[in-house]
Amino acid sequence: MFCSRSLFASTAISLTMMANAAYADLTAAQVWGDWKSYMEGMGYTVTATEAANGDTLAVSGVSVEIDGGPDIEKMRIGMGAVELVGNSNGTVDVVMPDVMPIIVEIDPKSTDKPAKFELAYTQSGQKMTVSGDPAAMAYDYEADTFSLALTSVLVDGTVM
């Protein structure tokens, strides 16, 4: 489970990065491209459905997959949809649902059983704004509350 803890930590860090705002022109596509590059740079394969409408980029069906190392064949993480909204001041707002489902699937290499974890990333009063320039993005994140709850565990198809 070491790989999954590392993945959760890297995902949480990327979702909640704090920095001072620096204003320059960014687009929603540049922010999404930065997220994809970051994850791909860590060895993940990233897939998603992208739909642009004006200054808004809706990203849904987000899935990241990685070879898991010596004990895990593959690990896949699926996440809910986000919208990246370009603002007139050159910043981009990241709009997430109040509850974002996260599904982690692990296929072992050994005789261990496959596992599936379902989580709910819940937040209220969330606001995330990305500023800066494409080479140096800064994230300003705030939320009244947020939590990550384990909602189900299946091992070899059996609810635990």
Name each model-derived stretch.
Residues 1-24:
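Gram-negative bacterial Sec-dependent N-terminal signal peptides
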Residues 25-160:
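Glycine-rich, small/hydroxylated-residue low-complexity segments
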